[in-house]
Amino acid sequence: MNYLTILLCNRKPTMLSRRNKEKSQHKEGVVGKYMKKDTPPDISVINVWSDQRAKKKSLQRCASTSPSCEFHPRSSSTSRNTYSCTDSQPDYYHARRAQSQMPLQQHSHSHPHSLPHPSHPHVRSHPPLPPHQFRASSNQLSQNSSNYVNFEQIERMRRQQSSPLLQTTSSPAPGAGGFQRSYSTTQRQHHPHLGGDSYDADQGLLSASYANMLQLPQRPHSPAHYAVPPQQQQHPQIHQQHASTPFGSTLRFDRAAMSIRERQPRYQPTSSPMQQQQQQQQQQQQQLQHTQLAAHLGGSYSSDSYPIYENPSRVISMRATQSQRSESPIYSNTTASSATLAVVPQHHHQGHLAVPSGSGGGSLSGSGRGGSSGSVRGASTSVQSLYVPPRTPPSAVAGAGGSANGSLQKVPSQQSLTEPEELPLPPGWATQYTLHGRKYYIDHNAHTTHWNHPLEREGLPVGWRRVVSKMHGTYYENQYTGQSQRQHPCLTSYYVYTTSAEPPKAIRPEASLYAPPTHTHNALVPANPYLLEEIPKWLAVYSEADSSKDHLLQFNMFSLPELEGFDSMLVRLFKQELGTIVGFYERYRRALILEKNRRAGQNQNQNQ
C-alpha cells in the first residue's frame, strides 16, 4: 500500500496546459533538435509547415506593394532563397514550382557565401546577363535541387519587368518602332546533366516558331515548286534582343527589321515565266469574280459576309441537288422558288459562279474552272428569294417560270393555294410566307401567328361539326339546334356576301345516324350536383341569422367539396329570397296599374 502511494505521489500530471509546457521547455531547453552553429543570429528559424497559413495573408499584402519586395539569399548554409519584404519575411512556397525557377541574380553567384544585405524600399535594377553566363546560371540552378522560391512574388516582379515603364536597359530606340513582345521562359528541372541544354533548345524552337508565324501570311496564293537557296538564309532576320533579367529571358522584335523582312518572300519560286503569267491570270480572274459577284448582289452579300442564320454553302448545294432528292409538301415551295437555277443555261466561263454538284460545302467565290456552274444572276435571285419574303405566293413565281421555259410544273400542294374552295379570312387576318415558302396566317387583332387557317375544323365552336356531302357539298351543322349553313359559324356574324345579293339559303340536313343529346346544358357546362338536393334546415337558419354569429360554426369539420356544396345551396336560398322580394313588389305594381286603369276608365265614362 505504501509503495502505491509513493508511485502516485511521484507521478507527474499528464494533462498539462499549453503555458506550462512552454515554461518547462524554456527551463529545460530544446531537447532532441539540432541547430547549426554558423547560423547568423539575425535570421530567425521559422517552421514553414506551421506558419504557412498564418503567413499567407501577409504575403498577399506584401505582393500588393511589390516595389518594397526584394530578392535576398538567406545564407550559404541554408540553400533556400526567398523574396523578402521590409516589414516581414514570408515563407510561403509554391509546391508545384519548387523545382521550376528562373536564373539566379548575378550577385548571388559572384558572392555565394555572403550574408543578406539590408532591404531597400525600391526595386534594384540589375544589368542583363550575357548568354554564356545565363547558361552557366541555369546549370547551377539545375544542379541545386533544394531551391524554394516564392512563385507569386516572381509573377508580380515578372510583370513589372515586362511593363514598358521599368524597361530602361533593354528598350529599343524610339525610331525603331513600338512593337515589343516580351515573354519569360520557365525551365523545368529534370536531371542535373540535362539542365544546361534545355534553355538553348527551347529558345531555338521558340524563335523558329515566331519566325514561321510572321512569315505565314506572305506565302503566295497559288501552289508552285519552291527551293530554298543557301544565300536566302543569310538575309538579315528579325532583329531580336535577348536580355536576361533576374526572372527570365526577354525576346523583343524591331518593327523596322520586321517591315524589311515582310517585304521579302520566304521562298523564291523557281517557276518558268509561263507559269508566272498563268498565276497572274488566275489572280485577275479571282478579282473579277469578286467584283462581279458584289455588283450582282447589290453590295449586300459579298463573298465573305452572310447573314448569321443561313449557311451560303448549304444553300447553294441544296439548290444544285434539288432535282435529285424529294421534298416534303411543307417545303415544296422552296423547290419552285429555287428551280430557276436549273433553267439558266450553263457555261464554262470565268465570270460565272462555280456550284459544286456534290453534297460538300460550296462557296460563292469559286475558281471558275471546270465543274457545273450557273450564272451569278441566278444565284443572287435565289439568295434574295430566301431572305426576302415574297409578297405573292410561290405558285405565281412557279407559274411564270413554267410559262417562260416550259419545263416547270406546279406542285400539288401549291395548287391547293389557288383553289377557289379555300376559306376566306376573317377581318384582321392576313397571310404571309416563310423563308422556305411555307404559308402561315397572321392575326393582327391578337398579334399572333398560326400555321392553320382560322376557319378550319380546329376553330369550330362547341356543338358544331363540318359535314362533307356528295349532294349538298360542304356545310356546317349545329348538333344541338339542328341548324345547318354553308358559312363557317365564326364567320356568319360578319360575313360579307360578294358573290350574290342574297345570302345562301339554309340547307336541310341529311339524315344521319348521330343523335344529338337531349340535355343541352350538359354539353356546355357540367351540371351542379347540389342544385336538386334538399337544403338542410340548419343551413336555412344560418342564412337568415345575423353575420355576427358566424364564429359559432366550426367550418374545419367539413371538407372542401362539402363547403362548396353549402355555398351553392346558400346561393339557391338567396335566389329564392330574391324571387320572393321581387314577386311581392311585382304584385304591388300590378295592383297599382289595375287601380290606375280602373280610375281612368271611370273618368272617361263621367265625361261622356
Swiss-Prot record:
Third instar larvae eye disk, expressed in a stripe in the morphogenetic furrow, decreases in the region of the second mitotic wave (SMW) and increases once again posterior to the SMW. SUPFAM superfamilies: WW domain. The modification Phosphoserine is found at S413, S416. Phosphorylated by Hpo. Residues 64-89 have a biased composition (Polar residues). Gene3D superfamilies: 2.20.70.10. Residues 358-373 have a biased composition (Gly residues). Residues 160-172, 229-242, 275-289 have a biased composition (Low complexity). Residues 274-294 form a coiled coil. GO terms for cellular component: apical part of cell; apicomedial cortex; cytosol. Interacts with Wts via its WW domains. Interacts (via FBM motif) with Mer (via FERM domain). Interacts with Kibra. Interacts with Hpo (via SARAH domain). Interacts with jub. This is Scaffold protein salvador.
